[in-house]
Amino acid sequence: MSGMGDGYVGTAQDAVRIRRLQKQREAERKKIQELKSKSASGNDQSGLLQFGTSSCEILDTAFKKETVGLVTREEYVEKRVNIRNKFEEEEKEKLQKLQQEEEELQLEKRNKKRKIKGSSRLSFAEDFENGSDEDDGENKSSGTGNLRCGKLGKDPSVETNFLPDSEREAEEQAERERLKKQWLREQEQIKNEPLEITYSYWDGTGHRRVIQVRKGDPIGNFLRAVQQQLAPDFREIRTASVENLLYVKEDLIIPHQHSFYELIINKARGKSGPLFHFDVHEDVRTIADATIEKDESHAGKVVERHWYEKNKHIFPASRWEIYDPTKKWERYTVHGD
């Protein structure tokens, strides 16, 4: 490439940038040299400064030109002071002028850099713009027009949903909070819904009853209501505490802390049927195909703990076990384990 060394291996944009920087440095060097020459030649305006002379010699020369003939001491001193003051004022004005020109030059450089930086956000856009300026300067004589690259901007057709957006994230967070509160309200409504439960008090034989509770009630509250319902008819229930009553559903002993809502929403499964149905369907597997699973529910049993401990080796108590939410029953069975 012309103007570059034999070992240069840069791109065309790099070459354009190098030529531009060289021209800028050359222009600045010339401007500084002109300022120095101007400051040296400007001394001739008042006739006080000459090349190679000191300030004392300049003052003496000016005093001799201003003083002709005999003068008094007072006139001599006054002229001497006036010439010195005039010399100092001229020097001060020249210094201020040089400083002002230097400040204007620095300001012009800063404005130029700021303009280049603001015109493009990509580094190569500056090279294209300045390169086109140089081409325009070289081709002015041939009458070619300016060829400039337009400023780079955003493409509205580009998908930007994956980019971080604090406003969009705040809206999504607010929507999640709204949906969460709505879901919690709906669950509270479900928990407050009435639930009719068919159960059987079991003391070796069944005594079926129906009672109504809320879906959100735990098993302990249900057994307390059962005790109040059975107390008039069964003396052993009147003297038993709620902690000594067991609720057995589908051959599983449900601990007191679990709620009906929990069993319903999780669609819990027992050994012999679903734990989330509390009405009663007759078991037809004894007269139909037992290999086909039926969605049938049996009346849960309420038993006294003392009776269970005494008869747990006898069917049906021998099949009962503690309910474990993590244990999954793949199929329902009526007899055996």
From Swiss-Prot:
Question: What cellular component terms from Gene Ontology apply here?
Answer: nucleus
Effect of gene disruption?
Shortened circadian period. The clock is hypersensitive to red but shows normal responses to blue light. By contrast, inhibition of hypocotyl elongation is hyposensitive to red light but hypersensitive to blue light.
Q: In which tissues is it expressed?
A: Expressed in leaves stems, flowers, roots, trichomes and hypocotyls.
Q: What induces it?
A: Post transcriptionally regulated. No circadian-regulation at the mRNA level, but fluctuation of the protein levels, with the highest level found shortly after dawn.
An example Pfam family from this entry, by short name, is XAP5
Segments forming a coiled coil: 13-41, 72-121
Q: Which InterPro entries match?
A: FAM50A/XAP5_C (IPR048337), XAP5 (IPR007005)
Enumerate the subcellular locations listed in this protein's record, separating them with semicolons. Nucleus
Isomerase found in the keyword field: no
Give start-end positions of Acidic residues composition bias.
Answer: 126-137
| UniProt-annotated stretches for the region Disordered | 23-47, 125-174
Q: Where are the transmembrane segments?
A: none
The GO annotation for biological process reads: ethylene-activated signaling pathway; miRNA processing; regulation of circadian rhythm; regulation of photomorphogenesis; response to blue light; response to red light; rhythmic process
UniProt keyword annotations, A-Z:
Acetylation, Biological rhythms, Coiled coil, Nucleus, Phosphoprotein
Q: Indicate, by first and last residue, each region the UniProt record lists as having compositional bias (Basic and acidic residues).
A: 23-37, 165-174
Report biased composition (Polar residues) as residue ranges.
38-47
**At what positions is N-acetylserine found?**
2
Q: What does this protein do?
A: Involved in light regulation of the circadian clock and photomorphogenesis. May play a global role in coordinating growth in response to the light environment. Acts as a light quality sensor directing both negative and positive transcriptional regulation. Inhibits growth in red light but promote growth in blue light. Inhibits clock gene expression in diurnal cycles. Plays no role in the control of flowering time.
Q: Which family does it belong to?
A: Belongs to the FAM50 family.
Q: In its UniProt entry, what is this protein called?
A: Protein XAP5 CIRCADIAN TIMEKEEPER
Per the UniProt record, the source organism is: Arabidopsis thaliana (Mouse-ear cress)
| Taxonomic path | Eukaryota, Viridiplantae, Streptophyta, Embryophyta, Tracheophyta
| Gene this protein is translated from | XCT
